[in-house]
A protein has these predicted regions:
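N-terminal Rossmann NAD(P)H-binding glycine-rich loop of SDR-like oxidoreductase domains
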Residues: 3-26
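NAD(P)-cofactor binding segment of oxidoreductase domains
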Residues: 86-114, 146, 151
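Conserved Rossmann-fold NAD(P)-dependent oxidoreductase catalytic core, especially the SDR/UDP-sugar
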Residues: 100-136
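NAD(P)-dependent short-chain dehydrogenase/reductase
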Residues: 150-201, 208
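Glycine-rich Rossmann NAD(P)(H)-binding loop
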Residues: 195-200, 225-232, 281
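Mid/C-terminal beta-alpha module of Rossmann-like enzyme folds, strongest
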Residues: 212, 219-264
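Conserved C-terminal active-site "lid" loop/helix of NAD(P)H-dependent oxidoreductases
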Residues: 234-240, 257-296, 301-303
Length: 303
């Protein structure tokens, strides 16, 4: 029996590493992980790793045509919102041009193209959002991700778009922090913390997002799907819930307005997603925020 081939981009990122974990022991899948540079996942066996620069169309063409995957899960992107605002050329290259290159080669080999998108395509005036709500990005990052969505919807033969919100989790080498570990570390220092009270999100556990990607792949589900956490909260509530979980002092938390932060890019005030479609079609069911904290703390202890 011919094994189904799945290729992912951005395998050194948080979601990419969780996808490797998820597919690692699946004997029915031939799994190809790609990222720029060396493989940073601790397990090097059981799948193929290939270095891939997604801004190089010749490299994309050569590597993807060689492997001929049945499904491409595209996780690589420039996701730092302020960086995208300051380096618009770099953001366009990674978030728009690379998608055009990938869509072109995906079409040529008849691959199912699964693309990761964001709540930042919305202006945040009427969240939580459904898959059919009208986007209106406030930042250049949001603009690039919406442009990529439109390219996929108009040019790709077989596509899925997975929109997500504020992903948290830990990579295997602990090289990157996340909002939960940052909040815990900041609270433990017992110094005053200024946290915004007027931005609302549905934080998404990286493992849940990986499962959402797998469900879309397994069910060959086409179209747009919201895959996020189920608990909507303000950023200050998020930090307070971390404090409650670890029994840390909440009195050091100062609630501030987001316009006092002088951030380069505008953020949507209220996002979060309605998950009805993903629950009904995919059977997606995310963990609670506290269950997510519990999991990443167990992982950080064993690292």
């Amino acid at each position: 029996m011919k094994l189904k081939k799945i290729l992912i981009t951005g395998s050194n990122g948080l979601l990419g590493q969780k996808l490797i974990d998820l597919y690692l022991n699946n004997k029915d899948i031939e799994f190809i992980a790609t990222a720029k540079g060396k493989n940073r996942h601790p397990t090097q066996q059981g799948y193929v790793y290939t270095s891939l620069d997604i801004t190089n169309p010749d490299e994309i063409n050569k590597i993807i045509r060689y492997h001929k995957p049945d499904c491409i899960i595209h996780t690589a992107a420039m996701t730092n919102v302020d960086q995208c605002e300051e380096d618009r050329e770099g953001a366009k290259l990674l978030n728009i041009d690379a998608v055009e290159y990938l869509v072109s080669v995906a079409n040529s080999i008849h691959a199912h193209f699964i693309h990761l998108s964001t709540d930042f395509i919305f202006d945040g005036t009427s969240g939580p959002y459904t898959e059919t709500d009208t986007p209106s990005p406030l930042s250049f990052y949001g603009e690039t991700k919406l442009t990529a969505e439109n390219i996929i919807r108009t040019q790709c033969k077989k596509w899925s778009i997975i929109r997500t919100v504020l992903v948290y989790g830990i990579v295997h080498d602990m090289s990157r922090s996340n909002i939960v570990l940052w909040a815990k570390g900041a609270l433990e220092k017992r110094q005053p913390l200024n946290i915004v009270h007027d931005q609302y999100r549905s934080p998404t556990l990286a493992e849940d997002l990986a499962i959402g990607c797998q469900l879309v792949e397994q069910k060959n589900a086409e179209g747009i799907f919201n895959i996020s956490g189920k608990d909507q909260m303000s950023i200050v509530e998020l930090v307070e819930r971390v404090a409650d979980f670890f029994d840390l002092d909440k009195s050091i938390i100062n609630k501030v307005s987001s316009n006092t932060l002088n951030q380069v890019a505008k953020r949507p005030p209220i996002t979060g997603f309605n998950l009805e479609k993903s629950r009904e079609i995919l059977g997606y069911e995310p963990r609670s925020f506290e269950e997510g904290i519990q999991l990443i703390m167990q992982q950080s202890i064993t690292k």
